[in-house]
Amino acid sequence: MTKEVKQLFGTDGVRGKANYEPMTVELSVLLGKAVAGVLQESKSGKHRVVVGKDTRLSGYMFENALVAGLTSMGIETLVLGPIPTPGVAFITRAYRADAGIMISASHNPYWDNGIKIFSSEGFKISDVIERRIEQMVALKEFGNFPDDCAVGKNKRVVDAMGRYIEFAKATFPRGRTLKGLKIVLDCAHGAAYKVAPSVFEELDAEVICYGCEPTGSNINDNCGALFPSVIQKAVIEHKADVGIALDGDGDRVIMVDEKGHIVDGDMILSICANDLKKKDLLRGNRVIATVMTNFGVLKYLESVGIEALISPVGDRHVLQNMLEYEVNLGGEQSGHMIFLDYNTTGDGIVSALQVLRIMIESESTLSDLTSLIVKSPQALINVAVKEKIPLDTLPLVQEALRDVRSSLGDSGRVLLRYSGTENICRVMVEGLKKHQVDSLAKTIADIVDSELGVGMVE
């Protein structure tokens, strides 16, 4: 009888509540063995794997479990400690490692954790490799186990943070500094809590830190990129030039201008795309945006001669489209920005540095840079759900969607989808008037909640 192969990977690796299926120590050991097995299938000889993590308390046990699985198969592991996800991608390349693993649940609460796997080139692994790993885990067939003298060694990389700090600074023009800029920085008590302040301070900015005291259980807790109100207030209070909010693993960024207004990923994409186009550095004068990208932002990009190619939501999908269409800039409203000229995955620190560079070079405030971008009124409501039942099988939900689309006509749109990483249904409505989109979004959200939900979430 053929054993069922259980799907472990979601849209961004394996993720779930720590110590519950699928995020258990036992599974992590098996995942370590499976990664080793895949590497040994691809080429013979010794292999090295980089392992990083964010600041969640459960990261310690998952780190040990993964290392145990990897080294039991003869893999040498290089443990980095707390470091942003883009730091793992960078160091995997810098050390010529065969793979990189990041232990993080990104923007999720502390009780969740996850495992993301990178190739030797620093890209997230393909669907094909994910399926092979799942197959090995299901069958518990990982290849040949080494004898006692051929198991792998585990080494701690003591200068991992320093290496990533220098890498991030190198994306800022040599000879320029951030002198004179006052920055409010929120690191979400996450993986960037040490490296991000160092990057901006070493470039001579005045940095006021929030969310830089991790306890293991306060990551993303009313702070960071999901809660920009923290830096909105702080920017005004400290009369700062700009606010920067990162998420728990440092791969996304939301900014705030000197007036306290939020500058999301859509606007960061627009600012950076226009700058690169002016310098003839935007490949094909195209960017990758997503189905969530604000219509007003798309109109702005078109007005400055930039074509936006639309991708499904998720930095993985954005990257796939960037590679397919040979585009060097892509991003999401949520703050995942990929600058392929610098890194192979979303990088919050590097993204913020590019915006700061543009501010300095153009002698502009952040509000100046966004002044020509007029966003369409948009409402986004997140509904926590018990399970992800296919939305097209829910008659009341489909009826509500038809009614809302009829109300909007050609002047707006509605998007209803499940999160790829959480039990959340996202309701997005866009139109001409703010009060209308708010009301229509709430109508749909209430019906989704009555059918599937456990309540609204922020």
From Swiss-Prot:
<dbReference type="InterPro" id="IPR005841">
    <property type="entry name" value="Alpha-D-phosphohexomutase_SF"/>
</dbReference>
<dbReference type="InterPro" id="IPR005845">
    <property type="entry name" value="A-D-PHexomutase_a/b/a-II"/>
</dbReference>
<dbReference type="InterPro" id="IPR005846">
    <property type="entry name" value="A-D-PHexomutase_a/b/a-III"/>
</dbReference>
<feature type="binding site">
    <location>
        <position position="249"/>
    </location>
    <ligand>
        <name>Mg(2+)</name>
    </ligand>
</feature>
<dbReference type="InterPro" id="IPR016055">
    <property type="entry name" value="A-D-PHexomutase_a/b/a-I/II/III"/>
</dbReference>
<dbReference type="Pfam" id="PF00408">
    <property type="entry name" value="PGM_PMM_IV"/>
</dbReference>
<feature type="binding site">
    <location>
        <position position="251"/>
    </location>
    <ligand>
        <name>Mg(2+)</name>
    </ligand>
</feature>
<dbReference type="Pfam" id="PF02879">
    <property type="entry name" value="PGM_PMM_II"/>
</dbReference>
<dbReference type="InterPro" id="IPR016066">
    <property type="entry name" value="A-D-PHexomutase_CS"/>
</dbReference>
<keyword id="KW-0479">Metal-binding</keyword>
<feature type="binding site" description="via phosphate group">
    <location>
        <position position="106"/>
    </location>
    <ligand>
        <name>Mg(2+)</name>
    </ligand>
</feature>
<dbReference type="GO" id="GO:0004615">
    <property type="term" value="F:phosphomannomutase activity"/>
</dbReference>
<protein>
    <recommendedName>
        <fullName>Phosphoglucosamine mutase</fullName>
        <ecNumber>5.4.2.10</ecNumber>
    </recommendedName>
</protein>
<dbReference type="GO" id="GO:0009252">
    <property type="term" value="P:peptidoglycan biosynthetic process"/>
</dbReference>
<dbReference type="InterPro" id="IPR005843">
    <property type="entry name" value="A-D-PHexomutase_C"/>
</dbReference>
<dbReference type="InterPro" id="IPR050060">
    <property type="entry name" value="Phosphoglucosamine_mutase"/>
</dbReference>
<dbReference type="GO" id="GO:0008966">
    <property type="term" value="F:phosphoglucosamine mutase activity"/>
</dbReference>
<dbReference type="GO" id="GO:0000287">
    <property type="term" value="F:magnesium ion binding"/>
</dbReference>
<dbReference type="GO" id="GO:0005975">
    <property type="term" value="P:carbohydrate metabolic process"/>
</dbReference>
<dbReference type="Pfam" id="PF02878">
    <property type="entry name" value="PGM_PMM_I"/>
</dbReference>
<comment type="similarity">
    <text>Belongs to the phosphohexose mutase family.</text>
</comment>
<dbReference type="GO" id="GO:0006048">
    <property type="term" value="P:UDP-N-acetylglucosamine biosynthetic process"/>
</dbReference>
<keyword id="KW-0413">Isomerase</keyword>
<dbReference type="InterPro" id="IPR005844">
    <property type="entry name" value="A-D-PHexomutase_a/b/a-I"/>
</dbReference>
<keyword id="KW-0460">Magnesium</keyword>
<feature type="binding site">
    <location>
        <position position="247"/>
    </location>
    <ligand>
        <name>Mg(2+)</name>
    </ligand>
</feature>
<comment type="function">
    <text>Catalyzes the conversion of glucosamine-6-phosphate to glucosamine-1-phosphate.</text>
</comment>
<dbReference type="InterPro" id="IPR036900">
    <property type="entry name" value="A-D-PHexomutase_C_sf"/>
</dbReference>
<dbReference type="InterPro" id="IPR006352">
    <property type="entry name" value="GlmM_bact"/>
</dbReference>
<feature type="modified residue" description="Phosphoserine">
    <location>
        <position position="106"/>
    </location>
</feature>
<dbReference type="GO" id="GO:0005829">
    <property type="term" value="C:cytosol"/>
</dbReference>
<feature type="active site" description="Phosphoserine intermediate">
    <location>
        <position position="106"/>
    </location>
</feature>
<dbReference type="Pfam" id="PF02880">
    <property type="entry name" value="PGM_PMM_III"/>
</dbReference>
<keyword id="KW-0597">Phosphoprotein</keyword>
